[in-house]
Amino acid sequence: MAQMQIDPEAGRRIHGKPEPRVHIETFGCQMNEHDSEIMYGILAQMGYVKAQGPDDADLLLFNTCAVRESAVEHAFGRIGQLKPLKYTNPDLIIGVCGCVPQVEGQVERIKRMFPYLDLIFGTHNIHRLPELVERARSERETVVDVWESMGDDFPDILPAAREGDLKAWVTIMYGCDKHCTYCIVPTTRGKERSRPYEVILAEVQELARQGFKEITLLGQNVNAYGKDLYGRHGEGAFDFGDLIELIDRNSPGIERIRFTTNHPKDFTRKMVEQIARAEKVCEWFHLPVQSGSDSVLRRMKRSYNRKQYLRLVGWIRELIPDAVITTDIIVGFPGETEEEFQETLSLVEEVQYDAAFMFMYSERAGTPAAQMEDRLSVPEKKERLQRLMEVQNRIARAKNEARVGKVYDILVEGLDKGKPDVVFGWTRGNILVTFPGDESLRGRIVPVRITRAGTWTLEGELVESPVTLA
């Protein structure tokens, strides 16, 4: 098990002060959030402490997202907004990392837009952060270190300074091999690479010892876990379902297990059966469908069709009747006709999703879809998105209203923002619930009866005295 060796005096040496301060601004998905936790963990071992904000930082990092152009522009806007900090504090080290630098042409764009940056690096060499920060201090030019793939020296174990003490991300694999025609992730995150199950289990058990109650297993395609390490699925090789069973049986203290994100192509009935048997695994499945049209799915290169997707949904409904199913949908993909869009609407009606992330197609340079013709106008895409949202929001509202009067176990996370007498938490199905309570409930699982439903959230009341988690 490869681990990092970190000099605890590095931060002091770089900045000339005993406790240099670091601030990281994170954009994008859970993988980016966890990457930022890892960077905080590495920097803590170098002697850094978290800054209150960017204004009092000695090291400022922007962990960027490239999945849509709007995410890139959001990050760039924030980087430009904080430019004055470099002039008020010339010793401040500013770096840009994450997915955007991995995209062809973006490093040059970043350097052109922000010539005052000290450091640019990507997703594959976070473990080189100590060396990169030292170089950023000593070299006159912007340090650029972007790798095309994850090297063999990438450690299996990385330190992480996690946000909170109840819920934790646990990366089980990196990258994606699917190469959907609209998606930049294989470029930014590389090929699928699984972490050994022994390392994952050890991390989960350590989190349990630290008092964490819930873990989320992370990967761009968790259902492909193990293919690169243990062989093809379906031939007796250790796979994602086996990992779920292993963790479920060997993680005393962990009360809830979640996982994201799934790819329908690799999600087998065997995995659904194993999940159904695992007591700690929550009844929540995020199953990105992207479109309900077979012809659009082919153009997207999603590697499944509508019938196969609905078969997977059927397995879940059969084996886990209370399952909450959510999805991602893209409208306005190149060439999408009204008839194809209607197929997406009919799929949404058929599946009855509990929630959906719905987006207009966003062109990503370097992807095959960017070369496709028959593009829809922005007004057309907006109009279709609005129709889709109306259908999905109606379904979500009705499903939540059906939950009124029912009792759910809620893991309480803390006080609702700005409300000293209201707490919030989540059902096993990943639905947000608020109800009257105080800080003493934090970290407990309590039974809550739902009294009011919104489109996306629920309100409730305590049923009985709270039960402290074991």
Curated annotation (Swiss-Prot):
Gene3D superfamilies assigned: Methylthiotransferase, N-terminal domain, tm_1862 like domain
A Pfam family that the UniProt record links to this protein: UPF0004
InterPro entries linked: Elp3/MiaA/NifB-like_rSAM, Methylthiotransferase, Methylthiotransferase_CS, Methylthiotransferase_N, Methylthiotransferase_N_sf, MiaB_methiolase, rSAM, rSAM_horseshoe
Cofactor note (record): Binds 2 [4Fe-4S] clusters. One cluster is coordinated with 3 cysteines and an exchangeable S-adenosyl-L-methionine.
Cofactor names: [4Fe-4S] cluster
Major localisation: cytoplasm
SUPFAM superfamilies attached to this UniProt entry: Radical SAM enzymes (SSF102114)
Xref: SMART domains: Elp3
Residues engaged in binding [4Fe-4S] cluster 1: 29, 65, 99
GO molecular function annotation: 4 iron, 4 sulfur cluster binding; metal ion binding; N6-isopentenyladenosine methylthiotransferase activity
Annotated TRAM domain residues: 401-464
Record keyword Nucleotide-binding present: no
Domain of life: Bacteria
EC class: transferase
MTTase N-terminal domain boundaries: 20-138
E.C. no: 2.8.4.3
Subcellular localization, as worded in the UniProt entry: Cytoplasm
Subunit structure: Monomer.
Function: Catalyzes the methylthiolation of N6-(dimethylallyl)adenosine (i(6)A), leading to the formation of 2-methylthio-N6-(dimethylallyl)adenosine (ms(2)i(6)A) at position 37 in tRNAs that read codons beginning with uridine.
Record HAMAP family: tRNA_metthiotr_MiaB
Protein name per its UniProtKB record: tRNA-2-methylthio-N(6)-dimethylallyladenosine synthase
Species this chain originates from: Symbiobacterium thermophilum (strain DSM 24528 / JCM 14929 / IAM 14863 / T)
